[in-house]
Regions:
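Non-catalytic propeptide/linker segments at domain boundaries
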Residues: 1-4
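Extracellular beta-strand/beta-solenoid scaffold signature
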Residues: 51-58, 79-88, 104-116, 131-143, ...
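Right-handed parallel beta-helix/beta-spiral solenoid domain characteristic of secreted/periplasmic
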Residues: 47, 58-110, 284-286
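Extracellular beta-strand-rich, repetitive "passenger/adhesive" scaffolds
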Residues: 34, 42, 72-79, 100, ...
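Extracellular beta-strand solenoid repeats
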Residues: 38, 46, 68-70, 81, ...
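C-terminal accessory segments
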Residues: 277-313
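N-terminal extracellular ligand-recognition/capping segment immediately after the signal peptide
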Residues: 8-66, 74-84
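Right-handed parallel beta-helix
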Residues: 66, 93-104, 119-133, 145-161, ...
C-alpha cells in the first residue's frame, strides 16, 4: 500500500502513521500490512507525537506494520527533524528509510529502544544523517531482536556529538542483532565508539566499500565487543584519520578479516590496534581531496572506499 503524504502535512506523529496503517488493514482485512509513505521532496517534517499529558512523545510504528519512509524524487531529499525518537516496539517484518535526510533536533537518539521488539530488517538507503548527539541505534531495555541492520549508500556526519554514546550501541544482554551490514557509505566524524556491544552480533559485522574519517574519539573504540565473539569483516574500505592518537581499535574474541582495504598513516589506534589492518604510508590528506571540509574524493586511483568518492576516470 503506497500513500503519498499531502503537502500540507509537516508533522509525522502516531496519528498520521496509524491512520495510514488502519486504512491498509481495513482494505486488506489483515493485521500485518506493508505500507510505503511517500514524503514530498524538499519538505521538512517534524518527527514527534504528543502524550496524553500534552508532552512530546516518541513516534511509534503500529504493531504488525512494515513501513517504508520513502523520499520522493525532486531537487532535494525530504528532511526528517527528529524531535523525539522512533519506537520500534512490537513485531515488524521491516522498517525502512529511503532517500531522506535525518537530523537530531532534540531526539538525541534515532532509536533508543526500551520495550520488546522483533524486527526483520531495519534499513537506511540513500540517506544522510547529521548531528546526532547520541546513537542511531541503541537498546536500553526490553527483549529486542533484529535480524539485520543495513546502512547502504548513506553519509553520516558529526555523529555521537555529545561524546556519551556510540553510533551503534547494543546496550543490553537481551538484544539479539543477527547482522550489521554497512556498505557504500561514508562515516565522517564520530565522537565516541563507532560500535559498542553488550551482546555479540551473531552473524557478525560486515563493512564494505565505506569511507571513514575522523573516526573514533580518544579512549573510544572502532568496535568494542569486549569478551564477546563478534566477527568483523572489512572489504574495499578506507579508514582515514582517527580523531585522537589515544583512540582504540577493535576488541573481540571473534575473527577479524580485512580484504582490499586501506588504512591511512594518521589512523592511529593507541591501543587495541587492528593488527590485521596495518596503517599505510599515505596520510588522509594524501588520499582524499579536502577531508577537513568533507570532500573525500580520492586523489589516488584505487577504487576503494565509498564509490561516491572515486576519482573520475
Amino acid at each position: 500500500e503506497k500513500v503519498e503524504l499531502d503537502p500540507s502535512i509537516t508533522t509525522i506523529n502516531n496519528d498520521v502513521i496509524a491512520n495510514i496503517v488502519t486504512a491498509a488493514q481495513e482494505k486488506t482485512g489483515k493485521t500485518n500490512v506493508a505500507i510505503t509513505i511517500g514524503l514530498q521532496a524538499g519538505q521538512t517534517y517534524t518527527m514527534v507525537s504528543t502524550a496524553e499529558d500534552g508532552t512530546d512523545a516518541n513516534v511509534k510504528i503500529p504493531e504488525g506494520a512494515s513501513v517504508t519512509f520513502f523520499g520522493l524524487a525532486g531537487e532535494s531529499k525530504p528532511v526528517l527533524n527528529w524531535k523525539k525518537c522512533l519506537d520500534i516496539a512490537g513485531s515488524h517484518a521491516y522498517i525502512r528509510f529511503q532517500n531522506v535526510s535525518m537530523k537530531d533536533t532534540g531526539c538525541q537518539y534515532l532509536i533508543n529502544q526500551d520495550k520488546d521488539a522483533a524486527v526483520g530488517e531495519l534499513s537506511f538507503t540513500d540517506c544522510t544523517f547529521s548531528g546526532f548527539e547520541s546513537s542511531v541505534f541503541r537498546t536500553k531495555g526490553g527483549v529486542v531482536s533484529v535480524d539485520k541492520i543495513l546502512v547502504d549508500n548513506c553519509v553520516m556526519t558529526n555523529m555521537s556529538t555529545g561524546g556519551g554514546y556510540p553510533v551503534f550501541y547494543i546496550g543490553t544482554t537481551n538484544t539479539n542483532l543477527v547482522k550489521l551490514e554497512l556498505k557504500n557509505s561514508t562515516f565522517d566524524t564520530t565522537s565516541h565508539n563507532f560500535i559498542q556491544l553488550k551482546a555479540a552480533i551473531s552473524g557478525g559485522v560486515t563493512i564494505s566499500d565505506c569511507t571513514f574519517y575522523n573516526n573514533v574519539a580518544g579512549s573510544k573504540y572502532f568496535m568494542d565487543s569486549n569478551k564477546l565473539s563478534t566477527d568483523l569483516t572489512i572489504i574495499r574500505t578506507v579508514l582515514g584519520m582517527s580523531m585522537d592518537a589515544a583512540a582504540k581499535g577493535v576488541r573481540t574474541t571473534g575473527s577479524i578479516v580485512i580484504n582490499e582495504s586501506m588504512r591511512a598513516k594518521d589512523c592511529v589506534y593507541g591501543s587495541n590496534d587492528i593488527k590485521e589492518f596495518a596503517a599505510g604510508s599515505l596520510t588522509s590528506d594524501e588520499i582524499f581531496t579536502d577531508p577537513a571540509n568533507h570532500n573525500f574524493t580520492m586523489k589516488i586511483d584505487d577504487r576503494i572506499g565509498d564509490p561516491r568518492w572515486y576519482k573520475a576516470e
